[in-house]
From Swiss-Prot:
It is found in: Membrane. This is CDP-diacylglycerol--inositol 3-phosphatidyltransferase 1. It catalyses: a CDP-1,2-diacyl-sn-glycerol + myo-inositol = a 1,2-diacyl-sn-glycero-3-phospho-(1D-myo-inositol) + CMP + H(+). It comes from Arabidopsis thaliana. One of its GO terms (biological process) is phospholipid biosynthetic process.
Amino acid sequence: MAKKERPRPEKLSVYLYIPNIVGYMRVLLNCVAFAVCFSNKPLFSVLYFFSFCCDAVDGWVARRFNQVSTFGAVLDMVTDRVSTACLLVILSQIYRPSLVFLSLLALDIASHWLQMYSTFLAGKSSHKDVKDSTSWLFRLYYGNRIFMCYCCVSCEVLYIILLLIAKNQSENLLNVVVATLTQISPLSFLLALTLFGWSMKQTINVIQMKTAADVCVLYDIEKQQKP
């Protein structure tokens, strides 16, 4: 007796998951934001930050309606990385030395790509599973949502502030930051607050890249030792 074939899941249904639709909205918001990033900085800031906030919304919606999907997770991470990369490229055209922002871009992409690939090699279901990490800061980042949120928000807000306070092309980054911090204003307080969270995030990115590289090397060693 022939076995009945299981019905194939509809691809379209996954594309139309509510959290994935939120993801498409994020992409659209970012497209509009970057289209006006030089002509209307305040509008860019509002659209970009709103898109960033939707990052938390799509995750909550996915869990609330049981619509967690691999496609959604990939869409979420790609949107995050691309939007941050675009903003860093813009800042590299405004401030000098531009290498600062290009280095941050390289670190962000390299650390997250290595982390995702090492997660695949280790057979883990999520790149946020770092319970076996020897770094307490790395475990704290992925284990404490409040701390993670603070670090991520600090990075994005800092980059937005730098875009808003730039008056001319080819600004000196250090001079602008020091001048803003010495003004003793709500903006200087916010800048200082975000600088600390930003520094934590970059430290974690370095740890993440090194930890992921270790996993890849360990995988190669174990592969060579197999008969």
